[in-house]
Amino acid sequence: MSKKRSSPNRNVQIADQIQRDLSELIMREVKDPRIGIVTIQSVELTPDYAHAKVYFTALTGNPADTQEALNHAAGHLHNLLFKRLHIHTVPTLHFHYDQTIEKAVAMSRLIDEANATRAKDD
């Protein structure tokens, strides 16, 4: 018997829905003071939907404390998602701080420094 595989498009649709729902649920349902203003940047699902890596940025607060608080609330958020999503398996949530913005700023700074050094040499 062959296993039915979900399409990549369905995976993306479910990840997008989880992203939208988590954004709302964190804002309305999670009362942990360590969680300030959080933006869910992306959600990556495993092919079997068992696990979801949730990438976030934090406008306020310490990112490490926010990550700890979100991972502490992951079980509660999982239960709330279960009530909203109409899928057989709601993934276990794993929150990760998204450092893309900081890395982009650092890279831009390095480029600016290299350009300034080159301008001095000319």
UniProtKB/Swiss-Prot annotation:
The keyword ATP-binding does not apply. InterPro entries: KH_dom-like_a/b, RbfA, RbfA_dom_sf. One of its GO terms (molecular function) is ribosomal small subunit binding. GO terms for biological process: maturation of SSU-rRNA. GO terms for cellular component: cytosol. Keywords: Cytoplasm, Ribosome biogenesis. It comes from the Bacteria. Gene3D superfamilies: 3.30.300.20. The keyword Cytoplasm applies. Monomer. Binds 30S ribosomal subunits, but not 50S ribosomal subunits or 70S ribosomes. Belongs to the RbfA family. This is Ribosome-binding factor A. It comes from Burkholderia thailandensis (strain ATCC 700388 / DSM 13276 / CCUG 48851 / CIP 106301 / E264). The gene is rbfA.
